[in-house]
Regions:
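Generic structural signal for well-ordered alpha-helical scaffold segments
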Residues: 27-34, 82, 159, 163-167
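Ferredoxin-reductase
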Residues: 30, 37-114
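N-terminal amphipathic/basic leader segments beginning at the initiator methionine
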Residues: 1-17
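Generic structural signal for well-ordered, non-membrane alpha-helical segments
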Residues: 2, 18-22, 26, 52, ...
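Gly/Ser/Thr-enriched, mixed-charge loops and adjacent short helices
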Residues: 12, 108-186
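Hydrophobic "anchor" residues on beta-strands that sit immediately upstream
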Residues: 3, 41-43, 177
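A generic structural signal for well-ordered alpha-helical segments enriched in polar/charged residues
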Residues: 28-31, 61, 65, 128, ...
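Glycine-rich phosphate/diphosphate-binding loop of Rossmann-like nucleotide-binding domains
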Residues: 19-27, 32, 45-54, 171-186
Length: 186
């Protein structure tokens, strides 16, 4: 594949991955999950890289232009997006992060409705759309246009989920327990 690798679409921000790419990923996904009498719902998270803000906005613009509603977690972790996709029955999730790559890189990782990496066949279709090798996607009109919602409460739900995983106290650790979700730049 041209853009998607082993874990999403990664590249140097505004060099090999730009807002036009992000917008088109959003347009494709918003259309791909459309079904009769179904409002597409997508949850988006990002790490703390500066370019994450522009990619979040571009993805949300593409998704809403295709009729999807966007739930923005803002700064969070990849596991939280995967968890919330499954728990809240989102059509998909998107994590904006390049993981361990340098700070000037970024990436778009699409998570399917089961909380796993998007299937390669769908990533190939996204690439064809980005390169103009597939049919144009119609714009949503009037009340079909999607909306963006602040969904920072989703991060709280994920933290509660992590806390619920620990049923018994850790002997010798005292009353303080710290959960650390290892993530570069977060």
């Amino acid at each position: 594949m041209k853009y998607f690798g082993t874990d999403g679409f990664r590249g140097e921000a505004n060099v090999t991955l730009n807002v036009e790419h992000a917008y088109k990923v959003g347009r494709f996904l918003g259309n791909y999950f459309q079904k009769e009498d179904h409002k597409v719902r997508v949850v988006i998270g990002k790490d703390t890289r500066l370019s994450g803000y522009m990619f979040e906005t571009a993805l949300a613009s593409g998704l809403t232009a295709s009729g999807a509603d966007v739930y923005e977690l803002h700064v969070t972790t990849t596991p939280s997006v995967s968890y919330l996709v499954r728990k809240e029955n989102f059509d998909c999730g998107i994590m904006i992060s390049a993981s361990h790559n340098p700070y000037f890189d970024n990436g778009i990782k699409v998570i399917n409705g089961k909380g796993h990496k998007l299937e390669p066949e769908i990533e190939e279709q996204i690439e064809k759309y980005i390169d103009g090798e597939s049919e144009e996607i119609p714009m949503a009109k009037r009340e079909a246009i999607g909306r963006c919602f602040d969904y920072t409460k989703g991060r709280d739900e994920y933290i509660e989920y992590l806390k619920d995983l620990v049923k018994e106290p850790f002997d010798g650790f005292g009353k303080w327990i710290c959960f650390y979700d290892c993530k570069r730049n977060l």
